[in-house]
Amino acid sequence: MSIVIINTGCANLSSLKYAIQRLGYNVIITSNHKNILNAKKVFLPGVGTAFSAMKMLNQFKLKDVLYKYQQPVLGICLGMQLLCSFSSENNGIKMLDIIHAPVNILKSNKFPLPHNGWNNVSVCDENPLFIGIKNNSKFYFLHSYALYENDYMIAKTFYNVYFSAAVRKENFFGVQFHPEKSGLVGLQLLKNFLEI
């Protein structure tokens, strides 16, 4: 089974690659269209800014590849946000518009930004991503922007306000947290995705 991590040019991909390999899968990091379209599963990671990530996706013409891809895709952190309509970052960034909802800065009030550390994830809807994972398990987060509650939300987290911790639309899944940095529950989630 070919597993692909899309090289978004703005993420530390080694921890994700290592986590997938620990589960017994071969994985490649690439932006090659053919490799992506022939993969059984695709990961869309991201750390940093929506602007730089979308610039890279446009530069390598990966938007159309993702629109054509029919197998499961998992967006992680910024990768989940890239699936959305737009981000309020930098006066507005158009994104992939697969999840028809905007990404906005977290309304943190007295809570510091970025939201950095472990937080509980409450599952809203039965979903294959969370099989074998206790509700309200802790996952590792690092972000300042968030997708608020919406029709595609399958799990949520509270950090001054509730926001989407995980979303799904058809073959596209997204998680705001980093499963590859979330210990055994994170590995279980990655395993669940790889077995869909």
Swiss-Prot record:
Q: What is its EC number?
A: 4.3.2.10, 3.5.1.2
**Record's GO cellular component, any one?**
cytoplasm
Q: Name one GO biological process term.
A: L-histidine biosynthetic process
The compartments listed are: Cytoplasm
- Record-annotated active site: 77 (nucleophile), 178, 180
* GO MF annotation, one: lyase activity
What chemistry does it catalyse, as a reaction equation? 5-[(5-phospho-1-deoxy-D-ribulos-1-ylimino)methylamino]-1-(5-phospho-beta-D-ribosyl)imidazole-4-carboxamide + L-glutamine = D-erythro-1-(imidazol-4-yl)glycerol 3-phosphate + 5-amino-1-(5-phospho-beta-D-ribosyl)imidazole-4-carboxamide + L-glutamate + H(+); L-glutamine + H2O = L-glutamate + NH4(+)
Q: Does the keyword Phosphoprotein apply?
A: no
Q: Which Pfam families match?
A: GATase
The chain positions of domain Glutamine amidotransferase type-1 read 2-196
Here the disulfide bonds are none
Which UniProt key words apply to this protein?
Amino-acid biosynthesis, Cytoplasm, Glutamine amidotransferase, Histidine biosynthesis, Hydrolase, Lyase
UniProt main location, coarse = cytoplasm
Q: In which pathway does it act?
A: Amino-acid biosynthesis; L-histidine biosynthesis; L-histidine from 5-phospho-alpha-D-ribose 1-diphosphate: step 5/9
Task performed by this protein: IGPS catalyzes the conversion of PRFAR and glutamine to IGP, AICAR and glutamate. The HisH subunit catalyzes the hydrolysis of glutamine to glutamate and ammonia as part of the synthesis of IGP and AICAR. The resulting ammonia molecule is channeled to the active site of HisF.
Subunit composition and interactions:
Heterodimer of HisH and HisF.
Please identify the protein, giving its name as recorded: Imidazole glycerol phosphate synthase subunit HisH
Q: Give me the gene this protein comes from.
A: hisH
